[in-house]
Amino acid sequence: MIQPQSYLNVADNSGARKLMCIRVLGTSDREYADTGDVIVAVVKEAVPNMPLKKSEVVRAVVVRTCKELKRDNGMRIRFDDNAAVVINQEGNPRGTRVFGPIARELREYNFTKIISLAPEVL
């Protein structure tokens, strides 16, 4: 569960290393983001000489959370870290590679481009 002021690792090669959530997109009373939700975040750590710079405001989709994710078949999945992939206004990833496992639930939210770039889909 990601809420404002939560820090996330970046799971792509867009140039950002750490993000801090500043808003969960959706309805106005939404407090938490889960896997597959879009957030507005600020870049807190960045790689030098890359397109994304520190203190830049970006959109990102949450791909991994430490909070367990319940599936319809009764299985529960949780990851070791909170991670997100930086996206543009159309919902396409800004990076060209995705690192680490990605939850299968992203397919339900039409993030198929991120699924195709991921090395492992759980």
Swiss-Prot record:
Binds to 23S rRNA. GO terms for molecular function: large ribosomal subunit rRNA binding; structural constituent of ribosome. This is Large ribosomal subunit protein uL14c. Keywords: Chloroplast, Plastid, Ribonucleoprotein, Ribosomal protein, RNA-binding, rRNA-binding. GO terms for biological process: translation. It comes from Angiopteris evecta (Mule's foot fern). It is found in: Plastid, Chloroplast. The lineage of its organism: Eukaryota, Viridiplantae, Streptophyta, Embryophyta, Tracheophyta. Pfam families: Ribosomal_L14. InterPro entries: Ribosomal_uL14 (IPR000218), Ribosomal_uL14_bac-type (IPR005745), Ribosomal_uL14_CS (IPR019972), Ribosomal_uL14_sf (IPR036853). Transmembrane segments: none annotated. Signal peptide: none annotated. One of its GO terms (cellular component) is chloroplast. Part of the 50S ribosomal subunit. PROSITE patterns: RIBOSOMAL_L14. SMART domains: Ribosomal_L14. Belongs to the universal ribosomal protein uL14 family.
